[in-house]
């Protein structure tokens, strides 16, 4: 059966390569989902939903493309009072391409779908582009990792987790896997020294043949259709048990190697230790306490288990509410949602963690100074850090400026920091935060 599956998947890949090919942003681009029924050239599918311009429709309608489960809101809506400051959208910035643009024009030119600026409890600015609006949901992708780490902190504070223990202590099924020799803290820092690599070009890799179909988020076209019910690997947790092995060239804690399977494991730990499905744990402990305007939802893998590595979907305002809670050390609306000690821990960067980032050649020209507890650190002393997702999703937090900015994007390139469109938006946000600091 596995050989049949391999043949079917490789045939599908050869027929429709899964590597995203960026398209230029121009008026000639196909408008997604045009016509009743949609024309074939404008049809969004699991095979093309991450390709621009199809992504402009798909990222705000992810529940139409992916399997999802609901994370319901409850209680009163926490208002985001103004007044709005129109001059923020008109402020001029120079992007990395040398173009002088207004704040809003810069974000729109760099494939943003929406951007929002908060200082304190005040909503200073929000702008939406294309067909996106304040009621639209948008997929977070890997910003979800930071959310998972945040709720994990509750279990740590309750004494239910030992960060220096192996994950095997809580998930015995992982005994003999690459995760047996690591600590949970090393998993949180992507320093687990496992041999699994997210290889998007080797069609015979474990990633292509097993992980991507199990994840069921369209990383490989046709994956939802070609995976047989009796496959060796059905869901992501099956993959973690069967395929993750230690990297013989590395010891845990020696290197920063960003790897989505670490967040998959974190989601499993949360569910196993709490005794609740991940979506229920998030809803009860975080989402219900943020006064969101809308329900959230999260993509699930083939086994219908929430994708902790990249499945969250919310509106932009509700993403900002989460960012405000993080900025304010876990407090929101007069209640302590997450222990302040855990929120602060993400900014307590050891010399070793910082050195691991500096030593990784992938990030040599990037602004990040560290990656810790599944957050991207810019300046720990200023409390400046981010949740980041592929295709340009960001929650930017700056404690010293009392500022949170959030933006969603459909930028063609998947990689975030190594993308000029991503850099342009992050640079403008950081410059704006500095100017807002001067007015405090």
Residues of each region from the PLM?
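Active-site Gly/Thr loop motif
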Residues: 293-296, 347-404
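Catalytic-site signature segments of enzymes, centered on catalytic residues
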Residues: 128, 134-135, 199-202, 209-303
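Active-site-proximal alpha-helical segments within enzyme catalytic domains
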Residues: 190, 262-269, 310-331, 393-410
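Active-site helix/loop module of the DD-peptidase/beta-lactamase fold
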Residues: 139, 143, 157-202, 245, ...
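Short active-site loop at a secondary-structure junction
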Residues: 106-116, 129-160, 164-178, 182, ...
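Active-site SXXK
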Residues: 121, 139-163, 187, 266-270, ...
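N-terminal leader/targeting segments and the immediately adjacent pre-domain N-terminus
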Residues: 18-132, 161, 189, 193, ...
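Structured C-terminal helix/loop/strand segments within mature extracytoplasmic catalytic/sensor domains
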Residues: 26-42, 384-440
């Amino acid at each position: 059966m596995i050989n049949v599956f391999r043949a079917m998947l490789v045939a599908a890949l050869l027929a429709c390569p899964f590597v995203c090919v960026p398209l230029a942003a121009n008026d000639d681009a196909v408008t997604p989902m045009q016509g009743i029924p949609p024309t074939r050239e404008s049809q969004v599918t699991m095979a093309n939903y991450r390709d621009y311009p199809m992504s402009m429709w798909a990222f705000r309608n992810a529940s139409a493309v992916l399997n999802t489960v609901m994370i319901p809101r409850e209680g009163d809506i926490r208002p985001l009072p103004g007044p709005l400051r129109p001059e923020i959208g008109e402020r001029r910035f120079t992007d990395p391409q040398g173009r002088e643009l207004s704040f809003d024009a810069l974000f729109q030119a760099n494939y943003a779908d929406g951007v929002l600026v908060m200082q304190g409890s005040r909503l200073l600015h929000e702008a939406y582009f294309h067909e996106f609006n304040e009621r639209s949901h948008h997929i977070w992708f890997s910003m979800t990792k930071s959310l998972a780490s945040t709720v994990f902190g509750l279990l740590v504070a309750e004494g239910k987790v030992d960060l220096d223990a192996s994950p095997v202590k809580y998930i015995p099924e992982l005994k003999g896997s690459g995760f047996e020799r690591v600590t949970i803290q090393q998993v949180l820092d992507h320093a687990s020294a496992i041999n699994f690599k997210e290889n998007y070009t080797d069609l015979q890799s474990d990633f292509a043949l097993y992980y991507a179909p199990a994840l069921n988020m369209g990383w490989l076209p046709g994956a939802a259709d070609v995976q047989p019910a009796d496959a060796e690997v059905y869901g992501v947790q099956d993959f973690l048990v069967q395929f993750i092995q230690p990297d013989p060239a590395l010891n845990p804690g020696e290197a920063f190697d960003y790897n989505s399977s670490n967040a998959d494991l974190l989601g499993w730990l949360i569910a196993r230790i709490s005794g609740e499905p991940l979506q229920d744990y998030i809803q009860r402990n975080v989402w219900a306490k943020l006064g969101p305007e809308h329900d959230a939802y999260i993509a699930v893998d083939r086994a219908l288990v929430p994708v902790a590595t990249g499945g969250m979907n919310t509106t932009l305002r509700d993403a900002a509410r989460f960012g405000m809670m993080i900025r304010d050390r876990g407090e929101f609306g007069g209640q302590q949602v997450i222990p302040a000690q855990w929120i602060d821990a993400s900014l307590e960067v050891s010399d070793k963690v910082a050195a691991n980032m500096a030593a990784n050649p992938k990030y040599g020209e990037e602004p990040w100074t560290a990656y810790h507890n599944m957050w991207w650190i810019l300046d720990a002393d200023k409390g400046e850090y981010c949740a980041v997702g592929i295709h340009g999703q960001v929650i930017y937090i700056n404690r010293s400026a009392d500022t949170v900015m959030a933006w969603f994007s459909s930028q063609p390139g998947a990689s975030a920091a190594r993308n000029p469109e991503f850099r342009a938006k992050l640079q403008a946000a950081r410059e704006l935060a500095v100017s807002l600091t001067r007015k405090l």
